[in-house]
Design a protein with these regions (language model features):
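Outer-membrane beta-barrel translocator/pore domains, especially the C-terminal barrels
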Residues: 1-274, 278-288
């Protein structure tokens, strides 16, 4: 009988990716270009995966700014081109799943979480970042929009071959003082459904002191392997509590609590501490699910 937990007992992974990058910054723009090659090899008990990929990336970004004594506004369009020469065969997934898109992930060369699967489509990515600061009423608003367009075949999502990615919208808004709201939407290219979203409230004193409560929704549930789960086709609806708090210059504590809104119980709890200095970083974490 089929057992989804009967995985390969031994997997040997080997990956090498040399690259060369050039960047230039101007008064109101920046340009960068990079070329590289990636070789990945997986050896398992039943098969071997050996893939080589050559790639090129070019990115151009404009900076439009408006300043006054009481406010600051910026609008930064970004255009990125990615082309690849890679093996187009589809191997069984070992380490990878299709990641949910946010603004930063949209500009990545690969949209899979591991190196054994690769998004091999040439594409153009358009993005816009808008920021508005006001010293008069302590307002801070960040808005990001992005979308990718495939030059050849699209990628397979939700049973369809898409020629463009979902539209990604993100925002972060200061409510008052150190309190913020943030959110993200991943909207279908036909604008008729939402693939994923999150909405949260956050207290942030600096990068090392943060508490965030957010709701998470994912219409699709792309697991790492093609396992048969009874709820595989159902969306994910969860609440998540994230904390990280520095107690000194070297020590930080952190934690994460995940609650499933359908099961009405906590399904993932992790906590720990981290020590870091100029030369090293070490931590200890406990996880229960």
């Amino acid at each position: 009988s089929y057992n989804p937990f009967n995985k390969e007992k031994e997997i040997k992974r080997k990956s090498i990716e040399p690259s060369l990058r050039y960047s230039q910054h101007y008064a109101s723009s920046s340009f960068s270009i990079a070329i590289g090659a990636e070789n990945v090899r997986y050896d398992t008990n039943s098969f071997a995966l050996d893939r080589t990929s050559n790639w090129l990336e070019a990115e151009y970004k404009l900076f439009f700014e408006s300043r006054s004594s009481q406010s600051f506004k910026s609008l930064n369009p970004t255009l990125k081109f990615i082309t690849l020469d890679t093996d187009s065969r589809h191997y069984a997934s070992i380490d990878s799943r299709l990641i949910s898109l946010n603004y930063n992930n949209l500009f990545l060369r690969n949209w899979y979480s591991g190196p054994d699967r690769f998004l091999n489509q040439d594409r153009v990515i358009l993005g816009i970042e808008h920021q508005k600061l006001s010293l008069q009423n302590d307002m801070d608003l960040n808005l990001l929009l992005g979308k990718a367009f495939f030059l050849d075949n699209g990628y397979y999502l939700d049973g369809k071959n898409k020629r463009s990615s979902p539209l990604v919208i993100e925002f972060k808004h200061r409510l008052k003082g150190n309190f913020f709201s943030n959110g993200m939407l991943e909207i279908d290219s036909d604008f008729n459904k939402i693939y994923s979203s999150h909405l949260g409230l956050m207290f942030e004193h600096n990068k090392n002191k943060r508490i965030e409560l957010r709701s998470i929704y994912k219409r699709l549930n792309p697991y790492i392997n093609d396992m048969y789960w009874l709820d595989k086709e159902l969306p994910i609806s969860q609440m998540e509590l994230l904390t990280q708090w520095s107690i000194s210059d070297q020590f930080m504590v952190f934690g994460k609590l995940l609650k499933d809104n359908e099961l009405h119980k906590s399904k993932d709890l992790s906590f720990g501490f981290q020590y870091s200095n100029c030369c090293m970083k070490v931590g200890l974490m406990k996880r229960k699910w």
